């Protein structure tokens, strides 16, 4: 089973590379390689450092088709890779991102993934499906990044989304992924938080102690 999980993760990296380079029509774009290297390292670290049960939970289908919003999010993710490839490699619509900013955004993408891995490391119930994992004895997690915000995984997602387009050197890809993905993450945060306050024992008390959903001092 774990071997199959490795293959799924590897195929996702390959799909990202194919979308970028096929759209660009060239592999001679260093920024794309740096972006994919971060992606690959995240996958390797995930399997090396995280609980195998958590990885299986993350990849489970949830017994039904993924919610429409999640499917749209996945499509937007791939679409922004294709747009970045077309922009940088072929048409140069908006590929004037300064090198220094591209470097900062690559670092921000890496930081976002690091935050997500930290959240998954301390929270063995971290799931892509909104549900109470009674089969795994789910309880409230208050350590690590959960001591500062209630949904650090979505905070990480916002960092990655905000920085991904400029990291790839395309303002157009940045606009696409931010406009269509940020509302999804905010909606998902609100929906999940309401669900947990009703369904997960102790979560309401935790929410009273940790006031911020995504960004300390803001929201």
Locations of regions flagged by a protein language model:
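Membrane-anchoring alpha-helices and their flanking helix-loop junctions
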Residues: 1-146, 155-219
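Conserved SAM-binding loop
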Residues: 149-150
């Amino acid at each position: 089973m774990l071997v199959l999980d490795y293959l799924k993760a590897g195929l996702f990296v390959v799909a990202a590379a194919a979308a970028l380079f096929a759209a660009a029509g060239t592999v001679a774009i260093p920024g794309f390689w740096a972006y994919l290297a971060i992606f690959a390292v995240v996958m390797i670290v995930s399997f090396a450092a995280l609980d195998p049960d958590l990885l299986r939970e993350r990849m489970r289908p949830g017994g039904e088709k993924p919610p429409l919003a999640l499917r749209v999010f996945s499509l937007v993710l791939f679409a922004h890779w294709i747009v970045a490839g077309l922009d940088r490699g072929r048409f140069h619509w908006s590929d004037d991102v300064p090198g220094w900013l591209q470097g900062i955004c690559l670092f921000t993408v890496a930081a976002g993934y690091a935050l997500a891995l930290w959240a998954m490391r301390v929270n063995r119930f971290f799931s892509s499906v909104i549900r109470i994992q009674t089969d795994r004895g789910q309880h409230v997690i208050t350590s690590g990044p959960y001591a500062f915000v209630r949904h650090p995984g979505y905070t990480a997602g916002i960092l990655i989304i905000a920085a991904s387009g400029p990291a790839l050197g395309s303002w157009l890809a940045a606009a696409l992924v931010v406009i269509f993905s940020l509302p999804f993450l905010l909606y998902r945060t609100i929906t999940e938080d309401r669900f947990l306050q009703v369904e997960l024992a102790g979560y309401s008390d935790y929410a009273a102690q940790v006031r911020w959903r995504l960004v300390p001092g803001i929201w």
